């Protein structure tokens, strides 16, 4: 985010939440240019005039859209997914299934307790938690959080990862 029509040269950085929402409460009334870099077909750019409380919906096109649902049977979580590239020219090279005991779930090693990699754009990924060391090691955290775990699908498309929404499950 860059102030416009001022002498400011530094960007005002802000980050989106896992669900894509964002909030920046450290802005002055001013004109800004917003440039969002991410796993999008092209950078998302918008101009906005901030006057008091201002809302701006940024629109970006991901390389792939991912739908996912989860079913729990005992200590097995089955995630059914479908990856749809936004262009037939885009290569989906890998699909990842993740689970975590905290609501943050992505490809970062701190944001996953388990990960499986497949190559199919549509299918299922099964997490057998009963036989999962990370599940056993973190069972006290999971039980302290109402037996919730969180799952998500990621798809590596054109070298970047787009994600499904995070699904909360109870095991």
Where are these regions (language model features)?
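Structured interaction patches on ligand/partner-binding surfaces of diverse proteins
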Residues: 38-63
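Structural beta-strand segments of beta-rich domains
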Residues: 75-79
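A short, solvent-exposed beta-strand micro-motif common in secreted/extracellular proteins
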Residues: 20-24, 28-41
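Beta-strand-rich modules
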Residues: 29, 39, 129-163, 171
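Short, acidic Ser/Thr/Gly-rich low-complexity loop/linker segments typical of extracellular
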Residues: 4-19
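Solvent-exposed loop/turn segments flanking beta-strands in beta-repeat/beta-sandwich domains
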Residues: 1, 85-111
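Proline-enriched interdomain boundary motifs that mark the N-terminal boundary
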Residues: 62-70
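Short strand-edge motifs at loop-to-beta-strand transitions and within beta-strands
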Residues: 20-22, 54-56, 121-129, 138
């Amino acid at each position: 985010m860059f102030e416009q029509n001022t002498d400011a040269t530094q960007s005002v950085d802000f980050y989106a939440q896992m669900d894509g929402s964002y909030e920046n409460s450290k802005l002055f009334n001013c004109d800004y240019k917003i440039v969002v870099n991410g796993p999008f077909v092209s950078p998302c750019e918008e101009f906005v005039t901030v006057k008091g409380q201002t809302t701006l919906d940024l629109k970006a096109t991901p390389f792939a859209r991912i739908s996912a649902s989860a079913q729990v049977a005992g200590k097995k979580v089955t995630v059914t997914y479908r990856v749809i590239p936004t262009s037939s020219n885009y290569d989906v090279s890998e699909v990842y299934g993740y689970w975590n005991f905290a609501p943050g779930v992505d490809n970062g090693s701190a944001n996953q307790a388990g990960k499986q990699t497949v190559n199919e754009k549509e299918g299922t990924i099964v997490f057998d938690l009963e036989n999962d060391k990370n599940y056993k090691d973190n069972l006290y955290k999971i039980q302290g959080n109402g037996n919730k775990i969180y799952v998500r699908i990621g798809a590596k498309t054109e070298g970047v990862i787009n994600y499904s929404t995070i699904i909360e499950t109870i095991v």
